[in-house]
């Protein structure tokens, strides 16, 4: 039974690692080409114009059902200028294309692209040739100015807008007129917020009734995720997701869109594009019935979006419609406030029901300590305390195994290579000594889901991004740059083995000796925060096992005396 126990432990270790890789293969992105984007300074991160020849922003608008009227559309004005409208708040820097009013550039000044260059903000949206990722919205339908043949050219009072000191809200109006109808596309941004409102004010001064639909969509090409690290072979999910009445969180991968588009009518809800640490989501009015669509356009871009209900404006009448756009970090508390299910875009995988409470507890510990590294250490101590009864039972079983080791050696000498008789004799000995040979496996079985859940917490939570601990650990979300923690972890595993009884089978003993080396190799590229958890967990296990083993040995000697 000892060899079976060893095989089980080894299998759990290998299967756990394979499960992480398999989850990424099933739900992560396919192998994608890497991009080579030149670094730029913070002030130059949003160019004044879109490079000529890149029409990814204006291609392939959604269609409306024939009953809403999509035929006989006149061509819209063609842009004569590609100057972008610059908009800056304390947390968002974005550029709006006057043709269509799409957000084609967006950076996050609070999130540096790299730790060693804090002046360069992370770029979320880009339509500059290297990558296509943008947020589009417009008015389509019978009288809508956004058509497949062209987009409206909006005018603004100025070319740049900035949230001033002491100002809590910034409003940017884009104006366009056609056939007696005046349109205002309004962007409303707030201080400290990553969500903004995009509104359409339609003033029908013509003699005819106006009809159309608002659409909003996210468009992205197949380029790699610039915020993801694949050193462990487990890149996080890059793809679309949406809310439906039956599923509060439904993924639609690029592979799904390659196979065909999705169409579904949803009341309210949201559509989003996910990447490592960041999410972009369109959130329509909760009362609207929307037609959600996913598709791949003629240029190979992947699109998820929705088309709202019909808008009817009588002659001389006015109508306003709006949607919310979130473009920023995956902050769970904020996402939950914006729309139900949106917090699930912090994708913890199939163990989310364990990961979410772990993150909740970790966040509360951090609110007291102010350091994520020390918070992980305290969390480890709490988890270890929670599993103390199971661990104690396991270590008692190991201590009894150690006590009967001489008897096992005698059985081996007696039966030699007769494995069947040896196994029968061992089982009789275990039964006589009241030892469960698999008793040491239970804590491993129970802790493995917690370990995997914590892995995804540390990998997916934006709070861990570039979070320092101390000394050489400046980012808990990536591997230890000097591999010191993995080596310490391997050493602690070796010490644990010395406290365990020596397996009677030579092959089993060799396998067990290899385990610290195997685990050390796996952990070389794991997030430093996860390795820190495992090191502390091993140290606590060593102390606990040493104490219990010595207590049992002392009790045995006392009973013998």
From Swiss-Prot:
GO molecular function: membrane insertase activity
GO cellular component, one term: plasma membrane
Domain of life: Bacteria
Coiled-coil intervals: none
InterPro entries: Membr_insert_YidC, Membr_insert_YidC_N, YidC/ALB3/OXA1/COX18, YidC/Oxa/ALB_C, YidC_ALB_C, YidC_periplasmic_sf
Annotated membrane topology: Multi-pass membrane protein
Pfam families: 60KD_IMP, YidC_periplas
Parts of the chain that traverse the membrane: 7-27, 342-362, 368-388, 438-458, 469-489, 516-536
Protein's cellular compartments: Cell inner membrane
Keyword terms, alphabetized: Cell inner membrane, Cell membrane, Chaperone, Membrane, Protein transport, Transmembrane, Transmembrane helix, Transport
One record GO biological process: protein insertion into membrane
Quaternary assembly: Interacts with the Sec translocase complex via SecD. Specifically interacts with transmembrane segments of nascent integral membrane proteins during membrane integration.
Recorded family membership: Belongs to the OXA1/ALB3/YidC family. Type 1 subfamily.
Protein role: Required for the insertion and/or proper folding and/or complex formation of integral membrane proteins into the membrane. Involved in integration of membrane proteins that insert both dependently and independently of the Sec translocase complex, as well as at least some lipoproteins. Aids folding of multispanning membrane proteins.
Protein name (database record): Membrane protein insertase YidC
